[in-house]
Amino acid sequence: LSAMLEDTENWLYEELSLTQDPVV
């Protein structure tokens, strides 16, 4: 389950990075 959540977080991060520049 943790692996699935990690993949989801990675996917969300990639989606967000494509739509907007990271603030960090």
Curated annotation (Swiss-Prot):
Modification Phosphothreonine occurs at: 19
Quaternary assembly: Homodimer. In the testis, forms a complex with p53 at 32.5 degrees Celsius which is scrotal temperature but not at 37 or 42 degrees Celsius.
GO-annotated biological processes: protein folding; response to unfolded protein
Keyword list, A-Z: ATP-binding, Chaperone, Cytoplasm, Nucleotide-binding, Nucleus, Phosphoprotein, Stress response
Expression by tissue: Expressed at high levels in testis and at much lower levels in brain. In testis, expressed mainly in germ cells. Widespread in brain with highest expression in cerebellum and medulla oblongata. Also expressed in renal medulla of water-restricted animals.
Lineage: Eukaryota, Metazoa, Chordata, Craniata, Vertebrata
Family per record: Belongs to the heat shock protein 70 family.
Main localization of the protein described in the UniProt heading: cytoplasm
Keyword NAD found: no
Protein name: Heat shock 70 kDa protein 4L
GO cellular component: cytoplasm; cytosol; nucleus
Function: Possesses chaperone activity in vitro where it inhibits aggregation of citrate synthase.
Expression triggers: By heat shock.
Compartments where found: Cytoplasm; Nucleus
GO molecular function: ATP binding
